[in-house]
Design a protein with these regions (language model features):
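Divalent-cation-assisted or electrostatically stabilized phosphate/pyrophosphate-binding catalytic cores
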Residues: 333-340
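Short, basic/hydrophobic alpha-helical segments
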Residues: 343-349
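Metal-cofactor-binding active-site regions of metalloenzymes
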Residues: 2-300, 352-354, 358-370, 374-477
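Short glycine/proline- and charge-enriched loop/turn segments
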Residues: 319-327
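Short secondary-structure transition/capping segments
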Residues: 43-44, 317-319
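C-terminal amphipathic alpha-helical interaction region
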Residues: 304-306
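Hard-cation-handling environments
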Residues: 310, 315
Length: 477
């Protein structure tokens, strides 16, 4: 029987162990998509206790922050909500999580949690209800006193070279500016442009949001669709000045419905007058804006990320109580491969298709995405159109294996830009180690089985590329 989580964890062959330890383990990290707050990086926050890091709490505006992966584990174990997002003492909240964790056998949360304890706190045991007090005391002492366990310390010891946060177009990027001007911060932190609220013409709050966007660009209002496009372009350019390498779109599904500028302008005027827009009108507006944005991304050499097929807030009661991003989302089954291809084709018609990374929350879309990639590659950069890494409900062992083997079967795994954390936690960089172990195990097994030659030079290039070098090239770091 193998020991739990030893140095060869998840590495099931001698070749896998060699690839991981000699090529993958010490590569820098490019976390090109995450949700960590830049303010905490600049202020070099020190957490009071492990529950603050893992379970979060409330923001000053009353919204909730924290790891909804962990919240779902706790809810699934019957833990009352008052211990999850409520006001129970942190020690009691931590106890409930510790008691739930052993039930998460086979869940990546079990591995991630114990990897974090091993890596950052030197804890060689496992977390459960019986060890909770011991772990609580150890972690809190280190969090409060160890200079390596401030926010910057965690980032530096994890060998993170680049962090791409997720930011709204109306954000003033104050904390990014301060980070950029601070010579003591050696890693790069850049904003990512996420204009979802400007695209969601069908949702409540659109009119108010467009008023805020107008204010940010120095206008009294955005009177027409050209004004909207101009405002978004100005904000894109501002983000680029602040170091932006990528954008991100979180879409229910990818639309494609062509319309003239006059049609789209009429739809926009209708929405701004407070009238409801139809599904068809929404798709026409979104398509028009996506094409405009895609052209700007290409002009400015930034990558476009598209995340789709998430059905959000399906528990209406809890969503109304706690708000978005609190653990009540699910995989959707929207079919929009043709629309994705049409969007890329429209941009390609004028040679203005940007570098694009496509993620679906539904793993059933993997083969479709894999075949879309090959239709729009060109010589701008190897792997210009990417199949995004296993995302959210798929970033577990099986999900990562399936995403990478599907990509390998239909495209070039060797040009893959690799994994990201998509996290709100500064301890989550162990997820990149988890990914690297799975990657090396897959490739190692192919070599062991005689399905790929034991070509040291080629294997080194592939492994190092997927771990960091490809992302460095792709995002022009």
């Amino acid at each position: 029987m193998k020991a739990f989580m030893d140095k060869e964890f998840m590495l099931q062959s001698a070749t896998a162990q060699h690839l991981y330890h000699d090529y993958a383990e010490d590569m820098p990290i490019c976390d090109y998509h995450c949700h960590i707050p830049p303010r905490e990086i600049y202020e070099n926050r020190r957490f009071d206790n492990i529950a603050q890091v893992w379970l979060g709490g409330r923001n000053p505006d009353g919204s909730y922050f924290g790891d909804h992966y962990k919240w779902r584990v706790m809810r699934s174990n019957g833990v009352p909500e008052e211990y999850i997002t409520g006001d129970k003492p942190d020690r009691e909240r931590f106890q409930k999580f510790a008691e739930a964790l052993p039930m998460a056998i086979g869940n990546p949360m079990y591995h991630w949690t114990n990897l974090e304890l091993h890596r950052f706190f030197g804890y060689e045991g496992v977390l459960n209800g019986d060890t909770a007090e011991e772990v609580w005391n150890l972690c809190n002492d280190k969090l409060q006193h160890d200079p390596k366990l401030t926010v910057r310390g965690l980032i530096e010891q994890s060998n993170v070279a680049f962090i791409g946060t997720t930011d709204d177009p109306i954000d003033d990027l104050e904390w990014h500016k301060k980070i950029k001007e601070d010579p003591t911060i050696k890693f790069t932190v850049a904003p990512s442009f996420r204009p979802d609220k400007a695209l969601n013409i069908q949702k409540p709050g659109f009119v108010e949001y467009m008023g805020k966007l107008a204010e940010v660009v120095g206008k009294e209002k955005l009177a027409c669709i050209d004004c909207v496009c101009d405002a978004l372009t100005k904000r894109i350019e501002f983000f680029v000045e602040m170091g932006r390498r990528a954008t991100d779109h979180g879409l229910d599904y990818v639309p494609y419905r062509e319309a003239t500028k006059e049609e789209v302008n009429a739809i926009y005027q209708k929405a701004m007058a407070g009238e409801a827009v139809t599904v068809e009108e929404t798709e026409k507006y979104q398509t028009y804006i996506l094409i405009h944005l895609g052209k700007q991304y290409h002009r400015l050499n930034v990558a476009m990320q598209i995340h789709y097929n998430c059905l959000r807030g399906v528990n209406r009661k809890m969503n109304s109580l706690l708000g978005p991003d609190t653990g009540f989302d699910m995989i959707n089954t929207a079919t929009c491969g043709g629309e994705i291809a049409s969007l890329l084709s429209a941009l390609n018609d004028t040679d203005e298709c940007p570098k694009t990374i496509i993620y679906s929350l539904n793993p059933g879309d993997d083969a479709q995405i894999g075949t879309i990639l090959g239709c729009f590659q060109n010589s701008e950069v190897p792997g210009k159109i990417q199949h995004g890494s296993a995302w959210w409900f798929n970033d577990h062992k099986i999900g990562m294996e399936e995403q990478m083997t599907r990509l390998a079967s239909l495209g070039l795994l060797g040009n893959f830009v690799g994994m990201l954390t998509d996290s709100r936690s500064f301890l989550s960089y162990t997820r990149l180690d988890y990914f690297r172990r799975i990657l090396c195990n897959i490739i190692g097994q192919w070599v062991e089985d005689g399905e790929y030659p034991n070509d040291e030079k080629a294997l080194e290039k592939i492994v190092k590329g997927i771990c960091f070098d490809n992302a460095k090239r792709y995002f022009a770091l």
